[in-house]
Structures are given as C-alpha cells and as structure tokens.
Amino acid sequence: MTTILKHLPVGQRIGIAFSGGLDTSAALLWMRQKGAVPYAYTANLGQPDEEDYDAIPRRAMEYGAENARLIDCRKQLVAEGIAAIQCGAFHNTTGGLTYFNTTPLGRAVTGTMLVAAMKEDGVNIWGDGSTYKGNDIERFYRYGLLTNAELQIYKPWLDTDFIDELGGRHEMSEFMIACGFDYKMSVEKAYSTDSNMLGATHEAKDLEYLNSSVKIVNPIMGVKFWDESVKIPAEEVTVRFEQGHPVALNGKTFSNDVEMMLEANRIGGRHGLGMSDQIENRIIEAKSRGIYEAPGMALLHIAYERLLTGIHNEDTIEQYHAHGRQLGRLLYQGRWFDSQALMLRDSLQRWVASQITGEVTLELRRGNDYSILNTVSENLTYKPERLTMEKGDSVFSPDDRIGQLTMRNLDITDTREKLFGYAKTGLLSSSATSGVPQVENMENKGQ
C-alpha cells in the first residue's frame, strides 16, 4: 500500500487537522469541491491565542466537512510536559537558556490523539498543514503510523494540482470569496507563530535573519520584558513537588494539572520568564532559528532542578543531564514513544523524579532574571553541618583527610607517568609556556 498519496483520493474519506485558519479552510473546501469526503479534526491544546474553540468545527462544516470534531488534548499535553520536566528532556540551550520542546510535545499529542479519533470514524487518510522543509511532516508521519498502521497520508501542500490552483495565501483568500465565504486574510506579521498550552514558537519570515531579534516579537504568553517602559514588579513564588510531580503554587493546590499549568503560565508570563532565542538543527540537519515562550515550563523546570541538585548525588545528576539531552533529541525527532525513549523516560522518572519532593521559593524579576530564596525538602542530602567552617563536631577529622589525600598519590603517580610518556613521543611540548606542568623523567631516579 502506498503510504503517501501525491494526488487527491476522490470519493474517499480524508481526515484533515483543521485549525480554522486560511490554509486549512481553503484546503478543506477545495477537497470537497474536487470530490473527496473531508472530515475535520481540531485539537484543543489550550492555545493562548485561540479565543473560541467551539466555533472552529462549525466553520469546518460550513466549508463542506462531512463531520467535524473538537478533540480535547489538554490533559494529555500537560502530562507529557510534566514528564519532559521530570526527565530533563531538553537538548537545545543557548547561554544557559533552554528551549522546552513545546512544539514537539504538542505534535506527539496531536499526532496520536487526532489519528485515534479518525480511526474511530473509519477515516484512514490524514492530511495536515506541515511543509516538506520542516520537522512536523516527519513527526506527524511517525506518530500517525504508530497509531494506525493502515494510515495513508495526503497533504494538499504536496499535491501539484492544489499548488497550481491555490499556491499562495492571496489565491486562497480569493478562492474562499469566490465560493461565497467572506474570508479576509489576517494582517501579515513579521513572523509565524505556533502555540499550545506549554509554549509558543515564533519563527520564519523576518526571524530567519539573525540581525532581527526578540524585540520584533509580540509575546502571547508573557510581556516585553526588554522594554523598560513595561513595569514588572518583583514577585515571590513557591513551587511544591511531590515525588516529581508539581502539586502546588504559592500553597494553592489544583483540581487538575491543566489548571496548575495555566496558573504557572500566568505567574511566569507576568515576568517574561522562559523566553529564549535558539539556533537549532532540524531533523533534516539544516539549521533554523526560533524565538520561544514557555513561562510555566520554565518556572517548574527551575524549581525541579533546584531540588534535584540538593537531593541526588553527582553521578545521578550527570546521568540525568546526559540521558535528558538524549531524550530531548528523540522527542524533537518525533520519537517520544519509541522504545529507546520509553526506556530513558522510565529510568529517569523511576529513579530520579520519584525522590523530588519539597518546595522552592523564587523571586522573579524581568525576563529570565530570578533568585532562589529558599529550598526545603525532607530528602535533601545537602547538610551544611557536614562542611561547616565553624568549630564543632565533624563527621571526619584532619587525620581522615590526610589519609584520603595520601591515597590520591596512586593516581597522581600514574598521571605523571602518562604525561612523561606523552612528552617523550612528542605529543606534549617542553615549552615553559605550556599549560601542562613540566614533567621530569623519574625513571633514572628509581621512581
């Protein structure tokens, strides 16, 4: 069976991921007029820039959808977002600022839940608005086929007939008007935005040029913290975790995780927390640039990692970071549910996140400027009395430390011999300006 269809399958059911925007509206109407039977599926991901979800399926029916469904994906999206925080599944960082993989998380949820809904309706052909140059075309392909092995893919934007007729936004708008729908194009921004409850992505157009900056972006989840005329008073916030799960903000608990994430977004958003400017490597190895917002994810991540460093030992923290970066890449590539990702997730959630219980109090200021004011946990292995500089009882004595240092002579001697061997073979310079200490040949001295 051909998985990817290059031309419209006339007379067959096609499920389209319908956003209600110009592109998917024109595509749905065009498919109906050309003889296909379109079914519209809209994911409610808690997009901060969407005002009326219920109106979207109604518009789809007006444009010719055989049926239109609104799928509430918020609970699953937040669950995957919390799992990503527990695992540190983030691999893109610049100058200490993190991209929280909010778009890949959204695609993992959308790609599985919409295709599952289509399968319930007997729809085995799926179309969406992703382009052939981006990451989403592969993410949706993978998640769709994982959910429905019989799935076929039809994308109007890969169909030359569709492109020839409606290749641009102006042509799409004219087509909608000619068909009796007063669809006016929205005002063009200097960049493109995609969002869900976890975060927003701003990219393309003017943001493709590196001499543009965050200053051209109008945040949809936060504030323009770089604008000094915007007043942003400092604010204290306390985040509580129980066994790796965020359960309270400023002492307030929530009936569900969706409400908790919304409140985290509101708190972080008041300061512009979690905005970052990243150059990243797409799945096809070409570099792209994006400016990201994720105020709630950033707030939870900061508090989580503060507890992490106070609870776990150095080797565990090292494995958390290494495996988290690896898992972040898998998530980015659309492999969040692959076996290698599930293995990493299970170990990180079982052995790391399960011990993260406690509270962290932060002072948020402008943007990513914050201070940690207090850290409290019954699981802390940070115990100041062990290393206090004040006189008093100690868990080890000066003689104990002398013995420990004496044992270091073994590996110091081995290292000295290795350095001499490198120098003898010419790998190390004998220059006095070398950063490596000058190593004397001790063989002739019987050492």
From Swiss-Prot:
L-aspartate binds at residues 131, 135-136. ATP binds at residues 17-25, 43, 129, 131, 136, 194. It is found in: Cytoplasm. Signal peptide: none annotated. GO terms for molecular function: argininosuccinate synthase activity; ATP binding; protein homodimerization activity. Its main location: cytoplasm. L-citrulline binds at residues 99, 135, 139, 192, 201, 203, 280. It holds the Pfam family Arginosuc_syn_C. Its EC number is 6.3.4.5. One of its GO terms (biological process) is L-arginine biosynthetic process. It catalyses: L-citrulline + L-aspartate + ATP = 2-(N(omega)-L-arginino)succinate + AMP + diphosphate + H(+). PANTHER family: ARGININOSUCCINATE SYNTHASE. Belongs to the argininosuccinate synthase family. Type 2 subfamily. This is Argininosuccinate synthase.
